[in-house]
Amino acid sequence: EYPQIAEPTADSVTLSAAALADGLRQVVPAASNDDNRLILTGVQLAAEGDGLRLVATDSYRLAVRDLGGQSVLEEGQSVLVPSRALTEVIRSLGDAEEVTLVLGAQDATFRIGGVRVTTRLISGDFPNYRGLIPETQANTLTVDRHALIEAVRRVKLMARESTPIRLEMSHNSLELVAVTQDVGHASERMDVTFEGEGLTIAFNPDYLLD
């Protein structure tokens, strides 16, 4: 028999569907797909100031997005929602203007028009990620997102699965470099805005595209 879904009894909150969809699209990809690490398969929804903070990590990537003014939880409260359920929420949001969220003790329900998505919350403590986020940034890179995506895709063609892409940053310049032994070398230079000392860092290209 199909399981019966109880009507949510907690108070409901109405949010901007566009703001929630935008935040979820940025955060959900960082959640883990490994069911052996159940806590990391969830997205934390937490009270942050007068708004809502979305956080996900698979221990390699960390994504944090604040939705200002989207008050859902009381100060200090947080819940952990399965990322798979939130993927369905993203699909259901479509062009909707509003979404109603009900957070119970064990369940979360999203109402979008005539669609209702209900999921069990994940029990457990989400990792303390705050120490990983610096309070100040010594270096700041500003780059056109679409141009960066296309450049990473081109350079990635030369990178094997385990080969990272180097990002070499200097004044108003970014060079993407991939070197694979016995295969070859690929690089591409972009005009950007960079503030700070020269810096070279390396990323898994798939994570960078996410």
Locations of the language-model features?
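Structural preference for solvent-exposed beta-strand-turn elements
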Residues: 1-210
